[in-house]
Amino acid sequence: MNKVVVKNVTFGEGAPKICVPMVGKTVAALKEEAEMLQTIDLDVVEWRVDFFEDVKDLAKVEAALGEIRAILPETPILFTFRSAKEGGELAVSDEFYFELNETLAGTGKIDLVDVELFNEEADVLRLIETAHKNNVKVVMSNHDFDKTPAKEEIVSRLTRMEALGADLPKIAVMPKSAGDVLTLLDATNTVFEKANQPIITMSMAGTGVISRLAGEVFGSAMTFGAAKKASAPGQIDVNELRHVLDLLHKQF
C-alpha cells in the first residue's frame, strides 16, 4: 500500500491519525479555535468551511484561511465544504462548490481537500487535477446519514474513489444496529487488504464509536475527534481518543 505523507504526518502506517474539525462561524471564532488546537495532541485540522458565515465570499475565505495557517503553520489542514446533501450546513450550487474548492486548492495554504464522490465525474476529475498540481492531497468522501449500505456497495464506493485518483478515500455511514457496524468494519478490512491507497472509514453515532477506535485493526487511516463541538454524531473527545488509540497501538 502507498503511504500518503502530508507535512510531518504519514497516513497508512501506525495508529490512525487524529483529525479535529474547526467549526467557527467567524474569523474571531476560528482564530480562537486554532489557538486552542495548538495545545492539543492532534495530527490534522479540518476546516469545515460550510460553518463559516462568509463562505460565499472567496476573498474572505482565503483571508480566514491565512489566519488559521498563521496560527497552525506546521499542522496539515484539510479544507472541507460539506454539502447539505451529505450533512453539511449550507446548500450551494455545484458550480459554487467546485469554484470554492478549486480556488482554495490553488492558494498554497491547504494540504488536503475534501471532494465528494457523488458529483459530475468531469467536475470531480478537474478538481482532483487542480489539487494535485498544487501538491494538495484529495480526501474523496461519501456520507450516508440514513443507513449503512451493503458491504458490496461500501467496497464499490471506496474502490471507485481510488480509481478516480483519490489519495485518501473516505466513507461514513449510519448504523441502525451492531450488525451494521460489523458490515462497515468488514468492508473496511476487505478494501484495506487490496487497496493501493490508505482509506478512512467510520460508522457514526454511539453505536459506531468502536469503528472510530479500531482503525489500526481493520484498516482505517484516520479518525475524527472533537475538541470543542462535534461536527458529526459519535465524535469522541480528542484527548480520550488519543489515549485509546495509543492503548490499542501498544497491543497491536
Curated annotation (Swiss-Prot):
Question: Sorted alphabetically, which SUPFAM superfamilies does this protein's record hold?
Answer: Aldolase
- Name the EC number(s): 4.2.1.10
What catalytic activity is recorded? 3-dehydroquinate = 3-dehydroshikimate + H2O
Where does this protein act, in terms of pathway? Metabolic intermediate biosynthesis; chorismate biosynthesis; chorismate from D-erythrose 4-phosphate and phosphoenolpyruvate: step 3/7
CDD domains, from UniProt? DHQase_I
Q: Which GO terms describe its biological process?
A: 3,4-dihydroxybenzoate biosynthetic process; amino acid biosynthetic process; aromatic amino acid family biosynthetic process; chorismate biosynthetic process
Q: Which residues form the active site?
A: H143, K170
Q: Which UniProt keyword terms apply here?
A: Amino-acid biosynthesis, Aromatic amino acid biosynthesis, Lyase, Schiff base
Which GO terms of the molecular function aspect are on file?
A: 3-dehydroquinate dehydratase activity
PROSITE patterns in UniProt: DEHYDROQUINASE_I (PS01028)
Give the superkingdom in one word.
Bacteria
Keyword Lyase (UniProt): yes
Q: Where does 3-dehydroquinate bind?
A: E46, W47, R48, R82, R212, S231, Q235
Q: Which family does it belong to?
A: Belongs to the type-I 3-dehydroquinase family.
Assembly notes: Homodimer.
What's its job? Involved in the third step of the chorismate pathway, which leads to the biosynthesis of aromatic amino acids. Catalyzes the cis-dehydration of 3-dehydroquinate (DHQ) and introduces the first double bond of the aromatic ring to yield 3-dehydroshikimate.
Q: What is this protein called?
A: 3-dehydroquinate dehydratase
Tell me which species this is from: Listeria monocytogenes serovar 1/2a (strain ATCC BAA-679 / EGD-e)
Name of the gene this protein is made from: aroD
